């Protein structure tokens, strides 16, 4: 059985996207065309709170910052799964409880592995 798709219902969404995109492009273009363009060395220099720049703004970051960021995202997503599970725990019963405990055990094993490998050590 085929479900009839009424494309006319999506017309307001299409108009919203077209008008929003057109307005954004128009405003950026008008600012680029009419705005003054007088670059000099002071305008192109990186700004550091009113002080003279101590070093080049394009310095390299340590890889450990990226590792901490990735670990934060992973465990933040775990928390995002825990909140709805806690709210719906009475409705999903034992199968939902057991599946979430397996999920948490996998994350706990991953955390222990990261800790044992020294991924959380900063020295």
Curated annotation (Swiss-Prot):
Keyword Ribosomal protein assigned: no
Record GO cellular component, one term: plasma membrane
Transmembrane segment boundaries: 11-31, 67-87, 92-112
Keywords: Cell inner membrane, Cell membrane, Membrane, NAD, Quinone, Translocase, Transmembrane, Transmembrane helix, Transport, Ubiquinone
The keyword NADP belongs to this UniProt entry's keyword annotation: no
Main enzyme class: translocase
GO molecular function: NADH dehydrogenase (ubiquinone) activity; NADH:ubiquinone reductase (non-electrogenic) activity; quinone binding
Compartments reported by the entry: Cell inner membrane
Catalytic activity from the UniProt record: a quinone + NADH + 5 H(+)(in) = a quinol + NAD(+) + 4 H(+)(out)
EC numbers: 7.1.1.-
Membrane topology qualifier: Multi-pass membrane protein
Gene3D superfamilies: NADH:ubiquinone/plastoquinone oxidoreductase, chain 3
HAMAP family xrefs: NDH1_NuoA
Function: NDH-1 shuttles electrons from NADH, via FMN and iron-sulfur (Fe-S) centers, to quinones in the respiratory chain. The immediate electron acceptor for the enzyme in this species is believed to be ubiquinone. Couples the redox reaction to proton translocation (for every two electrons transferred, four hydrogen ions are translocated across the cytoplasmic membrane), and thus conserves the redox energy in a proton gradient.
Subunit comment: NDH-1 is composed of 14 different subunits. Subunits NuoA, H, J, K, L, M, N constitute the membrane sector of the complex.
Family that this chain belongs to: Belongs to the complex I subunit 3 family.
Record's protein name: NADH-quinone oxidoreductase subunit A
Protein species of origin: Paraburkholderia phymatum (strain DSM 17167 / CIP 108236 / LMG 21445 / STM815)
